[in-house]
Amino acid sequence: INGEGWLGDDANFIAAKMIAAFELIHKKGAKTALTAYYTPSGVQKIEMREWLQKFVPQDMKDGVDYLFVSYYEDDNGGFAPDWSEIFTDLQSTFPASKLGIGECGNTAASATQASKKAMMRRYYTMPRYAKNYVGGYFWWYFVQDCVSGAGPGASNGENRGARDKAKATDEL
């Protein structure tokens, strides 16, 4: 939600759309999820946690069912965040939300099978950082990286669930 340039440059307008979507879905009794984009300090004009504090209203902080964090190490010079600190802080801000990693992946053009496997293992075996931490670990290029015969142009929507993720990780 807070990645600069994805949804436009007007944070207030982006927040208004987020709030409207939350209210509509929440009113219907459906599950709600919010994915925030993490970057190291100084990469974006406003850091993820500051954006969430400033633009997410309290009723949404208390009511969103899932809060996921999207992060790509390759896009951030290999920076490894302190996930314990991040998820502990998010748990205090979103006390009723289930927390997890919403997107991750080895995106570098130079990524090897070994680097993908190591990164996937690191994310898929992350400990439970906070009381409501549920994991997540949506590997963005799962089909391309883990489904036999799927090339680099394969759609993430194809063959969804075709293979067990743990088995595919072992075979990567």
What are the residue ranges of the model-derived segments?
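Well-ordered, non-membrane alpha-helical segments in soluble/globular domains
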Residues: 11-20, 45-54, 79-89, 113-126, ...
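Substrate-binding cleft of secreted/luminal carbohydrate-active enzymes
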Residues: 98-172
